[in-house]
Amino acid sequence: MKLKSRYTSLISVVSIFFSSMVMAESDIVISVDEGVSIAQPIAVVPFKVNGGVSEDVGQVVADDLRNSGKFTPIQRAKLPSHPASVAEINSQQWTDIGVDVVVVGQITPANNGYNVAYQLVDTLSNPAVVLVQGSFNVPATQMRQAAHTVSDQIFEKLTQIRGAFRTKIAYVVQRGVSAYELRVADYDGFNAFTVVKSKEPLMSPEWSPNGSKLAYVTFENKRPQIVVHDLRSGQRSVVAALKGHNGAPAFSPDGSRLAFASNQDGELNIYIANINGGTPIKLTANVGNNTEPSWSPDGSIIYFTSDRAGSPQVYRMSSSGNDVIPIGTRGSYNAKASSDGKNLIMIAGDNVVKQDLTSGSTEVLSSTFLDESPSISPNGIMIIYSSTKGTSKVLQLVSADGRFKANLPGAEGQFKFPAWSPYLTK
């Protein structure tokens, strides 16, 4: 049986490999579809600015916290006052509107750039108490990165979960029938850069565990091959070029191997290749079509899609190809394990679904159309995926608890195959 066609489907490090790429416009911008109704209220006061700063740092912080699905930032029009430090906060003002935590900050010129200082304040105490604070110097061009740093620190303080707002996404943009670009951007679509352009299809980008490389499928030699692209040097190496189709690359957690699918023997099967060369090893044994491999966090398990029982379904096997058992429901595919190994994110019934690997229970997270290619943030809090909107493919964002949903509409073209980076900073 033929699977659906969709199946074929750091700060210093970041600055190093970005400097060698072609810059693109910020072509995707988050637009809220469904807000959060039961998340924790938080107030992010506009940062007091001394000197000309074009970026609204406070708004970026508020957007980050909202995008996680854990917090509901209070609308600016409803803020009772605009303090810039804990000394200016009247706790009663904030508790009267149901806000227990407030973010305040200041931006001042410093060392040919700016100093960004913030405080996260507990207003349940009177006088208010600082929960966490920070201050750092950044060049003007890194103001959004500074805002994401503030968001990461606040998020971790309030949730005990590491923030992932300084991570990146990779995705493919198709314009027309013969113009493809592989791009990398901030998780929220800003600061997009083109990694490679091609007149032939580009598909299925996948980050290496340390964020320094991307594996992806290219048809540049008139047949599908899997290459590993070093984002620092720009060098590319072919890892899989078996006869027929080669697709769906997935790095092992240690970055030394790549699982992928190939139909060199007629049907699609899962293979593992060493990224430094050598003969790929076949893991599945010509039982139906097998594709879309992904690894468990410890590297001991590979999840994949197979139609061996008559229709697509997610299976698991050991990384040596043994102990194959079905996991997902009939019609499930595109499975990815969360960073803690407790959940699988997959597509089922054309929507993004979360499955608890202990209980087997499932939860539908998305309500969009023809969803595919889900990818999870490294802290497991957010999921990016592709869906169909009218005649276009667009990127969508949903929190892992399903509370927050947003779309990242592209300026022009079809946006496909999103892949969330690992952490890129210490």
From Swiss-Prot:
Main location: periplasm
Subunit structure: The Tol-Pal system is composed of five core proteins: the inner membrane proteins TolA, TolQ and TolR, the periplasmic protein TolB and the outer membrane protein Pal. They form a network linking the inner and outer membranes and the peptidoglycan layer.
Signal sequence annotation: 1-24
Function: Part of the Tol-Pal system, which plays a role in outer membrane invagination during cell division and is important for maintaining outer membrane integrity.
A Pfam family per the record: TolB_N
Location of this chain's protein in the cell: Periplasm
Keywords (A to Z) from UniProt: Cell cycle, Cell division, Periplasm, Signal
TM spans (from-to): none
One GO term of the biological process aspect: protein import
Record gene name: tolB
Organism of origin: Haemophilus ducreyi (strain 35000HP / ATCC 700724)
InterPro entries: 6-blade_b-propeller_TolB-like (IPR011042), PD40 (IPR011659), Tol-Pal_TolB (IPR014167), TolB_N (IPR007195)
Keyword Cell division in annotation: yes
UniProt-listed Gene3D superfamilies: TolB, C-terminal domain, TolB, N-terminal domain
Family: Belongs to the TolB family.
Record protein name field: Tol-Pal system protein TolB
HAMAP family: TolB
One CC-aspect GO term: periplasmic space
Superkingdom of the organism of origin: Bacteria
